[in-house]
Amino acid sequence: MSEMTPREIVSELDSYIIGQDKAKRAVAIALRNRWRRMQLNEELRHEVTPKNILMIGPTGVGKTEIARRLAKLANAPFIKVEATKFTEVGYVGKEVDSIIRDLTDAAVKMVRHQSIEKMRYRAEELAEERILDVLIPPAKNNWGQPEETQEPSPTRQAFRKKLREGQLDDKEIEIDLAAAPVGVEIMAPPGMEEMTNQLQSMFQNIAGQKQKPRKIKIKEAFKLLIEEEAAKLVNPEELKQQAIDAVEQHGIVFIDEIDKICKRGQTSGPDVSREGVQRDLLPLVEGCTVSTKHGMVKTDHILFIASGAFQVSSPSDLIPELQGRLPIRVELQALTTDDFERILTEPSASLTEQYKALMATEGVTVEFTREGIRKIAEAAWQVNERTENIGARRLHTVLERLMEDISYDASESNGQSITIDAAYVGKHLDELVADEDLSRFIL
């Protein structure tokens, strides 16, 4: 798991997300508390439960982006789910328990990757020996078994040197490689994905792992053999246990669009995709044991971060029990013109940098002036104010409209330089921004 301090986490998030300091601080503290808890003695560690977070703010202000970036920083099992995908147990649709199953699958994949990386050096040695055995077959004894010699022959050593220097990369060899598992496509109704996964695993295990001769270049064979040998060095049962421990101690679940499962007004009949889902989430957030194909997983110490726009509902519309299990509330602010201007220039791989790089592939140099960027930010803010406020996502729409002519003609404009200043932006956007009907349907 990550050992970054809260200040380091916020600094890293600042590289991608503009503003929203309160939300960044909250997730940074929550992430650091995961590390702090692991430093306690076992008895006290069991008593310290995570303080779950509810992020509240209009659409397009950075809630989901914080989750995306946090997933990369956490170095822990992480999953992002949409609350609207689930229904109450017993109805058609995904059950909330599948969140923990998917989180465990992600953890197994993560732990397997880490284990393979640790074994890579040994796997490279074994892969090298297998390729050399094909190039220079070892001498065999009277029983047809390879003879065990104390020292490799000079010829083998010479080929080993060439192999390491890449001189044999393009040479084709025929070698036995693990055959791809038999694919069994099973169509299942919504909510039955777990059953189909188990059936597919069963059919693959019946087929077994077979070796199949393939004619392939040494460079490609080396990569495949490394993966194959590394997989042999990993203990599957130990790997599963490590993954379950990682989920139970460090797992993070981000539930997006939680406001969409709030009950609005008085409705008759069962509310299976709203209040029913909230009731099903309660035991997960409070702590329960979920059965997965890898084993039983306890959710007592999994951190839950929920987010929602709450534009047509409020956090108080959540059932009281769920409100109590999300004790930390963070409100994200709507974005201003200054924020839009910073979003266009400051983040790593900002939108303007992306468009410049895309046009550079056609040999077209695009430059954005400071006044031009300010004008784009003002246009996006005005459209947000006069129509639906979709936050920073409006910048994508405005920029795409602004760059439409340049993108269309770029293939025939090799070597040209284009400067996007306030006048250029005004020429292409002023009419659309001024006309409310046009901006509503086009921007």
Curated annotation (Swiss-Prot):
ATP binds at I18, G60, V61, G62, K63, T64, E65, D256, E321, R393. One of its GO terms (molecular function) is proteasome-activating activity. InterPro entries: AAA+_ATPase (IPR003593), ATP-dep_Clp_protease_ClpX (IPR050052), ATPase_AAA_core (IPR003959), Clp_ATPase_C (IPR019489), HslU (IPR004491), P-loop_NTPase (IPR027417). Pfam families: AAA (PF00004), AAA_2 (PF07724). Keywords: ATP-binding, Chaperone, Cytoplasm, Nucleotide-binding, Stress response. One of its GO terms (cellular component) is HslUV protease complex. GO terms for biological process: protein unfolding; proteolysis involved in protein catabolic process. The keyword Chaperone applies. It is found in: Cytoplasm. The keyword ATP-binding applies. A double ring-shaped homohexamer of HslV is capped on each side by a ring-shaped HslU homohexamer. The assembly of the HslU/HslV complex is dependent on binding of ATP. HAMAP family: HslU. ATPase subunit of a proteasome-like degradation complex; this subunit has chaperone activity. The binding of ATP and its subsequent hydrolysis by HslU are essential for unfolding of protein substrates subsequently hydrolyzed by HslV. HslU recognizes the N-terminal part of its protein substrates and unfolds these before they are guided to HslV for hydrolysis. Belongs to the ClpX chaperone family. HslU subfamily. This is ATP-dependent protease ATPase subunit HslU. It comes from Yersinia enterocolitica serotype O:8 / biotype 1B (strain NCTC 13174 / 8081). The lineage of its organism: Bacteria, Pseudomonadati, Pseudomonadota, Gammaproteobacteria, Enterobacterales.
